[in-house]
Amino acid sequence: MTKLADMKCEACQADAPKVTDSELAELIRLIPDWGVEVRDGIMQLERVYKFKNFKLAMEFTNKLAELAEEEFHHPGILTEWGKVTVTWWSHSVKGLHRNDFIMASKTDQLLG
């Protein structure tokens, strides 16, 4: 299987399939630091990244913004002193699509 971080997001429309339960179980293992949250009935991926200060958190946020623009897929981002909370889900399908797992993996690579 190709590494998630090496994959590209595909255009996603309202009729695109959400990940199945078996796909979810397989994909979540590839991004072990991420959790699945359900908000307003919508499944989402979420991770909190820790930093030594606000400046480093903001630098990470800006790198993530650039990545999101490159891939045309945008997360929820909460930047605070010493941490950034990133939430991925596909608004168009109101849940999780393979793109969200690709972007979670790419987000992890921003730390390296």
UniProtKB/Swiss-Prot annotation:
Keywords noted in UniProt: Lyase
Broad class of enzyme this protein falls into: lyase
InterPro entries documented for this protein: PCD_sf, Pterin-4-alpha-carb_dehyd, Pterin_deHydtase
Record bears the keyword Lyase: yes
Catalyzed chemical reaction(s): (4aS,6R)-4a-hydroxy-L-erythro-5,6,7,8-tetrahydrobiopterin = (6R)-L-erythro-6,7-dihydrobiopterin + H2O
Cysteine disulfide links: none
GO biological process, one term: tetrahydrobiopterin biosynthetic process
Highest rank taxon of the organism: Bacteria
GO molecular function, one term: 4-alpha-hydroxytetrahydrobiopterin dehydratase activity
EC number of the protein: 4.2.1.96
Protein family: Belongs to the pterin-4-alpha-carbinolamine dehydratase family.
Protein name, entry field: Putative pterin-4-alpha-carbinolamine dehydratase
